[in-house]
Swiss-Prot record:
It comes from Macaca fascicularis (Crab-eating macaque). SUPFAM superfamilies: Homeodomain-like (SSF46689). This is Telomeric repeat-binding factor 2-interacting protein 1. It comes from the Eukaryota. There is a cross-link at K114, K194, K208, K212, K240, K373 (Glycyl lysine isopeptide (Lys-Gly) (interchain with G-Cter in SUMO2)). Associates with the I-kappa-B-kinase (IKK) core complex, composed of CHUK, IKBKB and IKBKG. Homodimer. Component of the shelterin complex (telosome) composed of TERF1, TERF2, TINF2, TERF2IP ACD and POT1. Interacts with TERF2 (but not TERF1) with its C-terminus. Interacts with SLX4/BTBD12. Interacts with TERF2; the interaction is direct. It is found in: Nucleus; Cytoplasm; Chromosome; Chromosome, Telomere. Residues 112-125 have a biased composition (Low complexity). GO terms for molecular function: telomeric DNA binding. A motif (Nuclear localization signal) lies at residues 384-400. Residues 280-305 have a biased composition (Acidic residues). Belongs to the RAP1 family. The gene is TERF2IP.
Length: 400
């Protein structure tokens, strides 16, 4: 009996034929995969089978999209991503048209018979699973509950999309993130005791957010507006809609991330610094100039007034774009900005390659603590480590 492929167990070692996606004339089939959590896994399978993957839609390329994407189904030009999985599972190249989205459901087609079986003259039909519809097992349920318990940042996380997309990407199960979310909300939420699991915990940062939400009910997430989402939106629109609906939560998480990044080692709490995203166009003052022109407490308080709404909106827009570009969550992108002094170019390079473009290291909590010390030797060590310009930028960033 054909079982669902477990792509998570051995993603680097597919066993299907290396010519699976090579035509009879020796040319490789070309595929374009719409951005999704499954894109990397699909690309691995395609490349191992001798196919090629396009960065953009090219003439002659097979356009792949996940079932349920409204734009893809409306155009009629896309083939279900299930085509790749079924080809690999059977280790044979199947009929493309049987998986075309729009005119006929790929899921329904997959449930009738594998297209390709007739082409090969197979006389013995196999029991087939519904494409994209795999029954949930007890192991799947435990995996879902455990993942929520360990990764849910707040009660509202389970009604959003980011948590479930991350779980799908982790390949703990073979279900889509929409199915995982639906399974938890309709069947598993509140049933942890049946699986000998405790209630889903909330991280310390989330507990702070929850307390603030209780004090300010208008800023709290009710969860009800998220029911307005439709599963037909492509992933890019999911991310935009989720952040628009939770704008207040995004602002609070930025503040929380800042506080977590900077460990206070004195009794009195210094004022938190906001995230200011800069393009690094103007030259900041040198550390020497900065030490000679320290603003008094009243000036600092004036500078630390609330950021204007347009500035908040611009910051959220930039962070959202980086989340989509690198397929990362809000916390990861925010921490990257904090470690790179809010510099957009440096943060983008760090997210792409794991290091700054100028070759200098990123800032740590200990570095920030050292930066506050009135010690010439310590300051010189920081200048040697990060460069005078980066030290000056860090000082300016912390002032904001």
């Amino acid at each position: 009996m054909a079982e669902a492929m477990d792509l998570g167990k051995d993603p680097n070692g597919p066993t299907h034929s290396s010519t699976l996606f090579v035509r009879e004339d020796g040319s490789s089939m070309s595929f374009y995969v719409r951005p999704s959590p499954a894109k990397r896994r699909l690309s691995t399978l395609i490349l191992h089978g001798g196919g090629t993957v396009c960065r953009v839609q090219e003439p002659g390329a097979v356009l792949l999209a996940q079932p349920g994407e409204a734009l893809a189904e409306a155009s009629g030009d896309f083939i279900s991503t299930q085509y790749i999985l079924d080809c690999v599972e059977r280790n044979e190249r199947l009929e493309l048209e049987a998986y075309r989205l729009g005119s006929a459901s790929a899921a329904d087609t997959g449930s009738e018979a594998k297209p390709g079986a007739l082409a090969e003259g197979a006389a013995e039909p196999e029991p087939q699973r519904l494409a994209g519809r795999i029954a949930f097992t007890d192991a799947d349920d435990v995996a879902i509950l455990t993942y929520v318990k360990e990764n849910a940042r707040s009660p509202s996380s389970v009604t959003g999309n980011a948590l479930w997309k991350a779980m799908e990407k982790s390949s703990l199960t073979q279900h889509s993130w929409q199915s995982l979310k639906d399974r938890y909300l309709k069947h598993l939420r509140g049933q942890e005791h049946k699986y000998l699991l405790g209630d889903a915990p909330v991280s310390p940062s989330s507990q702070k957010l929850k307390r603030k939400a209780e004090e300010d009910p208008e800023a709290a997430d009710s969860g009800e507006p998220q029911n307005k989402r439709t599963p037909d939106l492509p992933e890019e629109e999911y991310v935009k809609e989720e952040i628009q609906e939770n704008e207040e939560a995004v602002k609070k998480m930025l503040v929380e991330a800042t506080r977590e990044f900077e460990e206070v080692v004195v009794d009195e709490s210094p004022p938190d610094f906001e995230i200011h995203i800069t393009m690094c166009d103007d030259d900041p003052p040198t550390p020497e100039e900065d030490s000679e022109t320290q603003p008094d407490e009243e000036e600092e308080e004036e500078e630390e007034e609330k950021v204007s709404q347009p500035e908040v909106g611009a910051a959220i827009k930039i962070i959202r774009q980086l989340m989509e570009k690198f397929n990362l969550d809000l916390s990861t992108v925010t921490q990257a900005f904090l470690k790179n002094s809010g510099e957009l170019e440096a943060t983008s390079a760090f997210l792409a390659s794991g290091q700054r473009a100028d070759g200098y290291p990123i800032w740590s909590r200990q570095d920030d603590i050292d930066l506050q010390k009135d010690d010439e030797d310590t300051r010189e060590a920081l200048v040697k480590k990060f460069g005078a310009q980066n030290v000056a930028r860090r000082i300016e960033f912390r002032k904001k």
